[in-house]
Amino acid sequence: MADKNLRFLVVDDFSTMRRIVRNLLKELGFHNVEEAEDGVDALNKLRAGGFDFVVSDWNMPNMDGLDLLKTIRTDGALATLPVLMVTAEAKKENIIAAAQAGASGYVVKPFTAATLEEKLNKIFEKLGM
């Protein structure tokens, strides 16, 4: 069972989607959730420290989710952060690109709380969280 005090950063340019993910995380018992509206905003917050998990959209202005993921994986201080991609990009090549870039998991929108919980639990299990 993962620590319910884990600090999540939800990254999406659509505020309604950020709120949906935040509320689903709260339903699952995770109340320590902050938001960022794009990859640039997210990186600034991540580099300030203290986050344990990133849930990111793919399509965003300024820096998309894939570039954010690649930047996280090449940053020594952030490289081990779990990153769950939550996106409308359902094409096989997108899923492969995310996996090759180091995504910890991938959820296609729209999704249910059960789907999110299942993906999170798989990541927690794999990382021993």
UniProtKB/Swiss-Prot annotation:
The modification N6-acetyllysine is found at K92, K109. The lineage of its organism: Bacteria, Pseudomonadati, Pseudomonadota, Gammaproteobacteria, Enterobacterales. This is Chemotaxis protein CheY. Phosphorylated by CheA or acetylated by acetyl-CoA synthetase, depending on which acetate metabolism pathway is available. The modification 4-aspartylphosphate is found at D57. It comes from the Bacteria. One of its GO terms (biological process) is phosphorelay signal transduction system. Involved in the transmission of sensory signals from the chemoreceptors to the flagellar motors. In its active (phosphorylated or acetylated) form, CheY exhibits enhanced binding to a switch component, FliM, at the flagellar motor which induces a change from counterclockwise to clockwise flagellar rotation. GO terms for molecular function: metal ion binding. The keyword Transferase does not apply. It is found in: Cytoplasm.
